[in-house]
């Protein structure tokens, strides 16, 4: 498995000869020119996870790619094509399995209605298992080797992030959802995750691919 962090919550996953892109949002442009994708995945409708201005171009430039999104995305974002991926469902692509977990975005404020959110568990035989939770810390699937760990959002506090990482109990982690943080904030939460959990953290914000051993 090879992982490339393309800014904020966008992650390119290369595993079992397949290329999957998760959450092409508007806090990053590094994914705009990505080609040869097999799957495009979106955890929820917020624009920092699916950029309504540029996602159509991404889909058009990857005509062979399947597009699977949390079902509410289909109602609020104009996509050239796409299918709904609801919680507790799964898709298979060659030797790669994508399991959707959770169902709801974390609470931002009691006055803001909750929307749908699916965490994504990506696995292939003989490869590490990756968990990208989107914007929720409510579900901690078992058997995760690598956690895409959200560092900060208006829906989370560090104490919750640490407890979430402990519950997932992955061997490796790397930061996502860092677009609202100053560099000092990134280092603070990154350091706490590393020191307060059993997870080995990897800073992938330079956009260079990281190969995870099986």
Where are these regions (language model features)?
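Core dinuclear metal-dependent hydrolase active-site scaffold
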Residues: 1-35, 84-143, 155-160, 205-214
